Curated annotation (Swiss-Prot):
Name of the protein in its database record: LOB domain-containing protein 29
Span of domain LOB: 10-112
Superkingdom of origin: Eukaryota
Cellular component, GO annotation: nucleus
Pfam families membership: LOB (PF03195)
PROSITE patterns: LOB
Tissue: Expressed in roots.
BP GO terms, sorted: callus formation; lateral root formation
Organism field: Arabidopsis thaliana (Mouse-ear cress)
Induction (UniProt): By auxin.
InterPro entries (alphabetical): LOB
Length: 218
């Protein structure tokens, strides 16, 4: 908006609109050019008045006059477009945009946080990798072992012998030996438990007899 129309001899946009000679040191000359300044100053003149705009710029420091001229021109054009609210409607629209953008930003932050939590969660692992890894699927192998042992036991009972199976499988023979040894250990454990119960009963009888003897002699 800065213009040098006074130095070139042609009037500034404000003086051109007012149809007067642009004097040296015109307060409007640096900010309203000869070509487009007239249309911009027309809105200022209609809303604020030329004298009021001149007084406003004259009371400001030179460093602040450029921003003031831009602000006055913007407010005047906004008032012509919206005579009731003027630039306030633009301010409300910008504030609403800020609120909407903040809400969208908060939603994106929450989605990013949920994505990070889901990425760090162990449930996000591929379930197929669990079943493909032998170290993580003992349950599947245990069932295979149970079915294998069940088949071996069934074959042993079908042969009716304590040796090897007729098909010559060494695993059935070893399993039969392990089963026999397990039965032997179970019988030994039962004998020990029975012997311990007998000992406890005998010891209890001795205590009861001693107690009664103490009472009778007292």
């Amino acid at each position: 908006m800065t213009s040098s129309s006074s130095s070139s001899g042609s009037p500034c946009g404000a003086c051109k609109f007012l149809r007067r000679k642009c004097a040296k040191g015109c307060v409007f000359a640096p900010y309203f050019c000869h070509e487009q300044g007239a249309s911009h100053f027309a809105a200022i003149h209609k809303v604020f008045g030329a004298s009021n705009a001149s007084k406003l710029l004259s009371h400001l420091p030179i460093s602040d006059r450029c921003e003031a001229a831009i602000t006055i021109s913007y407010e005047a054009q906004a008032r012509l477009q919206d005579p009731i609210y003027g630039c306030v409607s633009h301010i409300f629209a910008l504030q609403q945009q800020v609120v909407n953008l903040q809400a969208e930003l908060e939603i994106l932050k929450q989605q990013a946080a949920q994505s990070m939590i889901f990425a760090d969660s162990p449930t996000s692992e591929n379930p197929n990798s669990y079943y493909g890894d032998t170290t993580k699927a003992p349950y599947h192998h245990d069932h295979q072992n149970i079915y294998h042992h069940h088949d071996q036991t069934h074959l042993v009972y079908q042969t009716g012998s304590s040796g090897t199976v007729q098909h010559g499988d060494a695993t059935e023979s070893s399993y039969h030996n392990e089963t026999s040894s397990g039965m032997g250990e179970f019988s030994i454990y039962s004998d020990l438990e029975q012997h311990l119960n007998t000992f406890n009963q005998d010891h209890l009888k001795e205590l009861q007899s001693a107690n009664f003897g103490y009472i009778s002699f007292s």
